[in-house]
């Protein structure tokens, strides 16, 4: 796994270097909300809930497009910031540390192929019958996804997700067996009136997984 990841990283750096002289397009999109509400959310007396609430939030996505074969995406989140709450940077004086990075990935196509690679912080969603969200895996994480369209009806994606590693907040433990990785594959198939997606996923916990 280490060797494969190293080769992919090297290929990504080479591809980025060859595209450095080209023009880059920036596309920015997002959502900026401020809201004020007054409501009795708890009918018990002396419940301590505030009836008047105000909050702000910001969602911003920046697409950096070098070519049809190379693109980077950053997605920032600020808030919810409930007005007056110091822990969320919305009390008197503001200056809170509320900027969060949701996505930070690079999309690129392997030269001379149709295979697409996504590397970095990205969404991971396993197929589900309802289409609402998978109860198995529906979250953002860090890893690599490789996808390819083999025929008009069949495609496939292979992913590696580094879920956990070195998460002792005090850094007092030196457990070499604290890495958690997930490896999975999905094979979407579409035919006349039928769409199915066989998939599988496995997890590994241990030293560098």
Q: What does each model-found stretch correspond to?
A:
Residues 155-209:
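Internal metal/ion-chelating core segments
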Residues 2-122, 144-158, 187-194, 198, ...:
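Beta-barrel outer-membrane channel/assembly domains of diderm bacteria
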Residues 42-44, 86-88, 131, 168-170, ...:
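Outer-membrane beta-barrel and related beta-rich outer-membrane complex signature
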């Amino acid at each position: 796994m280490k060797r494969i990841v190293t080769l992919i990283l090297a290929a990504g750096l080479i591809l980025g270097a060859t595209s450095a002289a080209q023009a880059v397009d920036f596309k920015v999109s997002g959502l900026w909300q401020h809201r004020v509400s007054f409501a009795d959310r708890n009918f018990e007396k002396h419940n301590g809930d505030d009836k008047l609430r105000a909050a702000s939030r910001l969602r911003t996505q920046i697409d950096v497009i070098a070519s049809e074969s190379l693109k980077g995406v950053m997605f920032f989140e600020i808030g919810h910031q409930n007005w007056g709450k110091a822990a969320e940077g919305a009390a008197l004086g503001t200056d809170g540390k509320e900027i969060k990075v949701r996505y930070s990935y690079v999309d690129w196509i392997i030269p001379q192929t149709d295979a697409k690679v996504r590397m970095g912080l990205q969404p991971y969603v396993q197929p589900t019958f309802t289409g609402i969200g998978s109860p198995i895996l529906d979250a953002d994480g860090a890893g690599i996804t490789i996808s390819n369209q083999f025929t008009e009806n069949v495609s496939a994606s292979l992913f590696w997700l580094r879920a956990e590693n070195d998460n002792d907040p005090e850094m007092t433990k030196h457990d070499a067996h604290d890495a958690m990785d997930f490896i999975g594959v999905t094979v979407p198939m579409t035919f006349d009136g039928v769409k199915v997606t066989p998939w599988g996923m496995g997890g590994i916990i241990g030293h560098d997984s």
